[in-house]
Amino acid sequence: LAKEIGFKEIIDIGSGDGRIAFCAKVLDLESYSIEIDDMLVELQNKLITLIDFHPYCSDATIFDYSTLNLGYPAFFIGGLAQMGGNELASGVLEKIHLISDLKKTGWVFAGTTSQKYPVDSKNKSGWGTLIEKNNLNTIQSISLPTAWTFHESDETPYIFTQSLD
């Protein structure tokens, strides 16, 4: 879907194993992975022998995204809003808003409809308040099986949004 929308680069933030960056590169999109855990970055470095994407070991909220020379990126935020994802996404959004060349960006959030997590009053699978606060336009949501992501019986909704600036 990211390629269909027209995004040129994918930045996988916090997925852990770099699966989103890996899949993006398979689709011939330039891709980067930002992960704070050095052991997970070592795992990603083993994957780049198969397909060339760019893993970085860094705190995504302080990483210098201007060094990537991005054109029309989509940022995939790993982690549920209710489990630290909201803070992670807010920190990255703040960094990106400081880059004058990046006014048009995509944001993709992994959500949940599970009853065991607090509900966001604006919905969007836990991301509604953040989406509204940051003036993001929801493009589409797709649901994927969670067997390969979280230990949940529900599917994982991915909410594709875009900055309105």
Language-model segments: what does each one mean?
Residues 1-5, 43-70:
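S-adenosyl-L-methionine
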Residues 7-16:
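Conserved class I S-adenosyl-L-methionine
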Residues 18-22:
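Glycine-rich SAM-binding Motif I of class I
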Residues 30-35:
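Conserved SAM-binding motif I beta-strand of class I
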Residues 38-39:
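Helix N-cap at the beta1-alpha1 junction of Rossmann-like dinucleotide-binding domains, i.e.
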Residues 72-90:
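A short SAM/SAH-binding and catalytic strip from SAM-dependent methyltransferases
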Residues 87-153:
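C-terminal substrate-binding/active-site "lid" region of AdoMet-derived donor-dependent transferases
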